[in-house]
């Protein structure tokens, strides 16, 4: 009997092999190409997590021989799932919803959805670091949705009708002072003015916008874009006083302001104290970018070296090219993979001619007749910070070399000027660089004084500063006697979306740019808009993770299944698990068609019960095991 079973098993295996050889070619992504794949470990059975499945049909479409059959209702259930893009956005912008509206051709409605959460949709459409895209489930199939570009597209199709639904409460008689007219301060001021408070923003510079105006070059964020948003903020009643430096928070309180928000940006740059750092030709990134933005005469040499591999470093490098530099290098301590700049910024910089030198430490600035001539460097194996926070660098002996330069720009960090809180014992700072606040309320230790933005976090994302401004506005409104409800409903009520077909393979479009030759001769914006057809097609790629079409029927025909696991790998929600003995069990049950009741995951069995550790240890190195722990109810 045993040999008979062995014979049946061998015959069955040969038939599966033959079936695989005869079936048509299939295009898929293997682990070497697809770094973030769903769990395909082999545990005890085939399991399907009903709570995680939204009925997107991805598994059925990925199956090469159509053994999965799904039936879902025509309309979705809304409100029980938060899409990853929505959940990841610091400001809580509902990206899934506005992307869906763009797919439906409702572009102005999409912009209204964005404006429900932020007063800077155009700014974010141009320069947002888009953490939402990093979490986009579509990226598990092919590529994430170009959410930032779609945000810009929506802004470009604004019809202004959202203003008719905007909130504007009657005057409260309360006065608020905002120190710093950057993204955090202006966001807070915008919402506080809508709550009826009299808001005055004090800006030490001659122009409004803070770091988004003087820290981000015009070719990335044209000034007219910022001006449009500032005009909207002024329209709701925010008064902005330029060229006004606040020396003391206490004085503002004595002048009759009921609450103060400290939202000064990180305008103070850092210079590494290297030998020779006092030579002519040394610049600081923040000063350099600010002077260029203010239209001051700024000269750079023919050869420029930027020390620092973050986005600011590449902003300096690309700005130097536009000012006439012939050779621009970015050198940094981090490895190429560990560089702090975004992949987009590095790619665009190199395309424009910036040379990148990662894994470098710096020993001294060389000079000739009082002017810089280069920077002496060492190649670096690795670096780390010890328990005291001191940098430990493992340099390669004998690797000394000089990067020639007429101008050296330090872009190695920046922090806020906090002289206005000096001597105030109630307001605590961290080494005089950032202000300690309550994380939720943004309140400092002094009654009536709040802080937000880079003054609290250090250099951070624009969207993070906007989110901090929202939080501060809520807390300050409550402090001033309001209810803290700054939410608005600006977009029309969305009709219940109907089900669409499962996703087909389609990659994100290339964002258009102006020609390279034109880029280097002007500060004109380099990135262009998506055309309407491309924008709609891109929005249609969205998996609509915030909508749940709970399957009424979900079955797997094991008579045809070839146990390839593509259904599991393709599921963007980790709703399927391949069991350790699933294939063997299917051999014994050739006529078995598994219904959803048969494969529904047993909540009593922990995720670890679905994989076999011995098999997991022997999986190829490129295979990723994602232990599918519950991350919280309602998260897709």
Q: Where is each model-derived feature located?
A:
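Iron-sulfur cluster-binding cysteine motifs and their immediate structural context
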Residues: 18, 58-75, 83-107, 125-155, ...
């Amino acid at each position: 009997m045993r040999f008979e079973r062995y014979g049946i098993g061998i015959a069955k295996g040969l038939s599966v092999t033959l079936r695989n050889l005869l079936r048509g070619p299939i295009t898929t992504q293997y682990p070497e190409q697809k770094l973030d794949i769903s769990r395909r470990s082999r545990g005890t059975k085939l399991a399907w997590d009903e709570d995680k499945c939204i009925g997107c049909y991805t598994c059925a479409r990925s199956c090469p021989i159509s053994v999965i059959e799904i039936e879902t209702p025509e309309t979705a259930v809304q409100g029980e799932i938060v899409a990853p893009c929505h959940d990841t956005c610091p400001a809580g912008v509902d990206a899934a919803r506005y992307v869906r509206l763009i797919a439906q051709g409702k572009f102005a409605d999409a912009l209204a959805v964005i404006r429900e959460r932020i007063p800077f949709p155009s700014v974010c459409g141009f320069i947002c670091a888009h953490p939402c895209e990093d979490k986009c489930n579509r990226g598990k199939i092919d590529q994430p949705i170009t959410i930032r570009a779609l945000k810009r597209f929506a802004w470009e199709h604004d019809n202004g009708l959202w203003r008719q639904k905007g909130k504007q409460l009657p005057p409260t008689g309360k006065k608020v002072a905002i120190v710093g007219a950057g993204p955090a301060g202006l966001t807070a001021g915008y919402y506080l003015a809508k709550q009826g408070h009299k808001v005055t923003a004090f800006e030490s510079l001659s122009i409004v916008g803070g770091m988004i105006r003087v820290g981000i070059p015009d070719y990335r964020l044209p000034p007219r874009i910022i001006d449009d948003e500032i005009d909207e903020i002024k329209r709701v009643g925010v008064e902005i006083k330029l060229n006004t430096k606040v020396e003391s928070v206490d004085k503002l309180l004595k002048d009759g302001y009921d609450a103060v928000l400290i939202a000064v940006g990180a305008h103070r740059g850092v210079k590494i104290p290297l030998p020779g750092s006092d030579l002519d030709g040394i610049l600081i990134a923040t000063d350099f970018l600010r002077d260029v933005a203010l239209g001051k005469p700024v000269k750079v040499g023919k050869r420029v070296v930027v020390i620092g591999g973050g986005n600011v470093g590449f902003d300096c490098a690309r700005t130097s090219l536009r000012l006439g530099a012939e050779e621009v290098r970015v050198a940094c301590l981090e490895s190429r993979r560990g560089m702090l700049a975004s992949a987009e910024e590095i790619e665009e910089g190199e395309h424009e001619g910036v040379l990148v030198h990662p894994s470098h430490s710096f020993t001294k600035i060389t000079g000739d007749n009082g002017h810089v001539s280069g920077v002496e460097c060492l190649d670096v194996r690795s670096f780390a910070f010890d328990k005291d926070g001191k940098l430990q660098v493992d340099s390669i002996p004998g690797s000394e070399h000089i990067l020639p330069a007429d101008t050296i720009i330090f872009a190695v960090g920046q922090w806020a000027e906090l002289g206005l809180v000096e001597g105030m014992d109630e307001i605590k700072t961290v080494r005089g660089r950032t202000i300690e606040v309550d994380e939720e309320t943004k309140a400092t230790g002094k009654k009536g004084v709040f802080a937000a933005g880079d003054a609290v976090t250090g250099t951070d994302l624009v969207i993070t500063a906007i989110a901090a401004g929202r939080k501060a506005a809520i807390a300050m409104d409550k402090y001033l006697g309001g209810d803290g409800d700054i939410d608005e409903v600006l977009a029309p009520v969305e009709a219940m979306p109907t089900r669409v077909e499962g996703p087909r393979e389609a990659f994100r479009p290339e964002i258009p740019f102006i020609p390279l030759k034109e880029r280097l001769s002007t500060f004109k914006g380099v990135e262009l808009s998506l055309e309407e057809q491309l924008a709609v097609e891109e929005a249609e790629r969205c998996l609509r993770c915030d909508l749940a079409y709970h399957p009424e029927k979900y079955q797997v025909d094991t008579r045809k299944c070839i146990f390839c696991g593509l259904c599991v790998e393709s599921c963007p929600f980790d709703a399927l698990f391949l069991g350790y003995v699933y294939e063997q069990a299917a051999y014994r049950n050739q006529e078995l068609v598994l219904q959803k009741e048969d494969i529904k995951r047993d909540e009593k069995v922990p995720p670890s019960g679905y994989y076999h550790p011995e098999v997991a240890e022997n999986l190829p190195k490129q295979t990723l095991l994602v232990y599918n722990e519950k991350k919280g109810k309602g998260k897709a």
